[in-house]
Curated annotation (Swiss-Prot):
Pathway: Purine metabolism; AMP biosynthesis via de novo pathway; AMP from IMP: step 1/2
Cofactor binding note of this UniProt entry: Binds 1 Mg(2+) ion per subunit.
The protein, known as: Adenylosuccinate synthetase
Organism lineage: Bacteria, Pseudomonadati, Pseudomonadota, Alphaproteobacteria, Hyphomicrobiales
EC class name: ligase
Reaction equations catalysed: IMP + L-aspartate + GTP = N(6)-(1,2-dicarboxyethyl)-AMP + GDP + phosphate + 2 H(+)
Source organism per UniProt: Agrobacterium fabrum (strain C58 / ATCC 33970) (Agrobacterium tumefaciens (strain C58))
InterPro entries: Adenylosuccin_syn_GTP-bd, Adenylosuccin_syn_Lys_AS, Adenylosuccinate_synth_dom1, Adenylosuccinate_synth_dom2, Adenylosuccinate_synth_dom3, Adenylosuccinate_synthetase, P-loop_NTPase
GO molecular function, one term: GTP binding
Amino acid sequence: MTNVVVVGSQWGDEGKGKIVDWLSERADVVVRYQGGHNAGHTLVIDGISYKLSLLPSGVVRPGKLAVIGNGVVVDPHALIAEIGRLEVQGVKVTPENLRIADNATLILSLHRELDGMREDAASNSGTKIGTTRRGIGPAYEDKVGRRAIRVMDLADMEALSAKVDRILTHHNALRRGFGATEVSHETIMEELGSIAERILPFSETVWLLLDKKRRAGARILFEGAQGSLLDIDHGTYPYVTSSNTVAGQAAAGSGMGPGSLGYILGITKAYTTRVGEGPFPTELHDEIGQFLGEKGHEFGTVTGRKRRCGWFDAALVRQSVATNGITGIALTKLDVLDGLDELKICVGYKLDGQEIDHLPASQGAQARVEPIYVTLEGWKESTVGARKWADLPAQAIKYVRQVEELIGAPVALLSTSPERDDTILVTDPFED
């Protein structure tokens, strides 16, 4: 038995929700370790759809413990609203099934406002990143700047007052630069006071809790948000998120040592998508790109934004396999490729006349690369609902084997529809 870390191996939206749902049924504890409420997924259980963006997936299953780790930035208002939506659907979220790290950073209204002001200013200059304007980046900045308000701070309003002064010194200077009204001390104190009683009952020393669970033999599932190519260090900077999204963050963002992480499962879409700005070497602007977007229902769970679509980029996923230490992948949305006459896979790039096998880190170089493709024959038969290899067309199997060879990692699971049972299991990550 081992613990499992789920990471996205592309730019997010790889279909983690279904795979995490499938795994969470067998886990005892499900842990979110990075990000905020800027990335979401939909779980379908007994025909009911649950849309989650901040809460770990385990919260919708009876008897599971959901944990929000210290690596997450928590918008208390968004959390309370999400809990409320689940309660309307009959899911009770209590301190019995949800614990939040007492040292997790809080997202405040001033973070959301700063995020929006920056995006507006960047839009005018043509340099916008395309954030969700939810305050994620500014909250992480305050965390690194050692002026953040954390969950534990809500328990001591007297000490909190000085911390609010400190954060306002920074933010009001920025607001003056944008020509915005300054925020008063009273406004932030009232904001925090209004949610303290709702948030504090969930507060926990999470590293200690997880250590006890591990020693007791619990199966722990670490649930990543977004994708590895959005990692602040290893992604397509500056068009990235504000946290580390690679598997190593599961240790730092939860307080468990890296030796306890276990199987690293990379969720990998059979083609490539991206939301927002940034380089995308295999992007398709033709009818095939439109076909993938429409058939794959490529719209964001949280934002509703249309995703850009392109061919599978093995060079990028190969990088993710290396930077995450991926043990095996879950290949999703293979069925979306049904009916195409031919398929292309990017195996490397040309940069200034030279062939290279990885995407360079330089923003300028990323804009100049041209994909090098191999072409495979497509298939006309349907793969929808396939639950064993024998159900797949020969050309689909050939495509999967080519992906495995090019990225240097085996397929552990193969998803053939949004339904959780339409999955071909090759290797059980929890039993590896």
